[in-house]
Structures are given as structure tokens and as C-alpha cells.
Amino acid sequence: MKKSQTGQYDLEDRTFTFAKNVRALAKQIPKTASNIEDTRQMVRASGSVGANYIEANESLSKKDFLLRIKICRKEAKESRYWLRLIDTGDDSKVKNYRDELVQEATELTSIFGAILRKSESNYRENPKLEIRNKFK
């Protein structure tokens, strides 16, 4: 992942990489009936994390920003759920890759939760405070 000049990871890049990695995993898992449906859900949820983060950064209001960040957190949690359901078969390499993605989904959930708590706190303290793009 690419770091910004301040040494922090670009969250837009991180969510994009997460979605791409989930798609890479989808190509490696056994094509069972349950995996096919679970994979569809997993791919949708993982892509939605980054898409909603982009929408949050382009939000027109504070309420819209908070709503989009909540959706990001929800989709990251959902991604984790679908990742955990996937049957990796007997391939330990695929299982380890899946476990890394479960960890990344957990970290993204925590990051969006922290952004949400900080933003809601700032919003309650000063409702006129502009919070758009603060975490970009």
C-alpha cells in the first residue's frame, strides 16, 4: 500500500486494494454451490467499502458524510462475514490468504468506527463544523 507524505496509508487506496485482493481470492476458491453465492456477496460487499468511502469524501453535507462512513463500516463487517463463510477446501495457502483478508476487513471496520466516533463527536460539539474530506 502506498503511504502519503505524512506516512499514513491512503484509505482510498487501501479499500481499493482490499476489493482487488478479495477478487483475487474469489478466483482461487473451490466452485461449490455455497461458495458461488457467498463469493458474489463477498465481492459486492468488499467493493462497496471503497465506493462508499469515495462517496463520503464527496458528500454534500455532514449528515451524508456520517451516513456514508456508517455504510463503509457496515460493508467492512459484511465483507468479514462472507470471507469467514467461504470454504477454502484443503488448500492451506488459500486459507491463509483468506485469513489475511478477514484481518484486513476487521482493521477497516475499526478504522471506519474510529472515523465515525471522531466525526460524530466533532459534529456534536460544533454542528456547523465542516467535516468533509477531513480523513482523506
Task: Put a short name on every predicted segment.
Residues 1-55, 59-136:
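Short, C-terminally biased terminal segments at protein or domain edges
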